[in-house]
Amino acid sequence: MELLDKLNWRYAAKAMNGQKVSEEKIANIIEAARLAPTSSGLQPFEIIVVKNQAIKEAIRPVAWNQSMITDCSHLLVFAAWDTYTEERINKMFDLTNEIRGFKNEGWENYRQMLLSNYPQKDAEENFNHAAKQAYIAFSAAIIAAAFEGVDTTPIEGFDPAAVDKILGLREKGLRSCVLLPIGYRDTDKDWLVNLKKVRKSTEDLVTIVE
């Protein structure tokens, strides 16, 4: 199965060679993330694509000095909504009605249910929920990159508050939750490149309830 072949090929690159990834491949990776499913279809996050080398240099010290931050072609920053608001929820429901060209009573009832639920919750709880949705898109981007023959490095080891400040995310009602350098592996410097992939066995990972 081609999908499994690609997933076996990919790994978290520990060194990148600085080679640029084509804009076409980057666009495909971002499109896969855009098409990823999210709870209630709200897509409560944004993807910041950092191409500017100076910005990457600024982020590296607050990301455990990991070389992939500066040696990648593009750095994707997945930033979740800091909370759910009526405006944000309504915007997505209105967009759905506009694209589909009609209003559905059940859909509008669902809108009211969300409006009576999410905005009243604690902002931190809402952010944590939004971040989970960002991770779904993050995973789609990783898989799409593998299909494009492009390497990625999932990074949670960074100071979110510092990254938020560098990119001005808090002013936009966003908080960074995960980073994804995209580029090509440096086979001479990457200690992980030739090591076997290690995963739990299916038996240890999966429980089937008949």
Protein language model features and the residues they cover:
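Acidic, surface-exposed loops and disordered segments
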Residues: 1-210
